[in-house]
Amino acid sequence: HRERCTALHGVPTMFIAELNHPMFDMFDLSSLRTGIMAGAPCPIETMKQVMDKMYCKEIISVYGLTEASPGMTASRVTDSMEIRATTVGCAFPNVEVKVLDPATNKECPPGTPGEMCCKGYNIMKGYYKNPEATAAIIDENGFLHSGDLGVMDENGYFRITGRIKEMIIRGGENIYPREIENFLYKMPQIEAVEVAGIPSPKYGEEVGAFIKIKEGSSLTEEEVRLYCRGQIARYKIPKYIFFVDGYPMTASGKIQKYKLKDVGLRLLKEKGVEVI
């Protein structure tokens, strides 16, 4: 605003907080042109709002991890808004990115989800004095295994669908939290949403949605379920809906999704609901 900055970088939670700041409309952001969205998968609706409301028409997505220095893929400013909002772009030049089947370590064909893996000049030599940890993440072919689930399309663009450990398995059905999150973000009352698995003695896991409501808005559990009904598969509709003020975060602003299961169990216990 004051310095007339032209670029803005951050993780999705930062952009979401900025977009929903009560004084957002008081700032002149028209000098913004570009930026980088990275650090965590970005909701499609958030990316579109950053382009439209924050004037970052040339913002791109970058995907990677610290062990990859820290990038593997990136979209381009010349890509369409839809591509930049829904994918993390293509592999960096001179870097090999593959989607590998976690069970067989074989490359998945386009359109088939698997683990995002990378090989190239950007990959670390290893963890300092920890060969066991290094061997656990870099395979014998030199590919770094990210632990992230992704899919590549016919044009070489990658889309992140979640974390392998965060995938919910309900009665044998694989459920990707990000798919449900992207759908729920379309509800105008929702500022932020995170989806995680809640233990279930019958199905193994049930879908839990942790929703932060926009200031001045109201929302009920039934309204959320009605919004989902007929739009997504029944088994993907959250059984448990929690309205929260925030999420467990790292110092760098990333959401600690792995802690949400315990948060959900605690909130259910407070309601007198025992699930395990």
Task: Please report, for each region that a protein language model flagged, where it lies by residue.
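Gly/Ser/Thr-rich phosphate-binding loop
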Residues: 2-10, 19-83, 96
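AMP-binding/adenylate-forming catalytic core of the ANL superfamily
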Residues: 1, 8, 21, 120, ...
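Active-site and channel-lining beta-strand-loop segments
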Residues: 96-103, 244-252
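Adenylate-forming AMP-binding core of the ANL superfamily, especially NRPS adenylation
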Residues: 41, 81-129, 137
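Beta-strand->loop->alpha-helix junctions that form or flank phosphate-binding loops
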Residues: 59-67, 87-91, 196-199, 242
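Active-site glycine-centered loops adjacent to acidic/histidine catalytic or metal-binding residues
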Residues: 39, 64, 89, 148, ...
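Acidic/polar alpha-helix N-cap and adjacent early helical turns
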Residues: 262-276
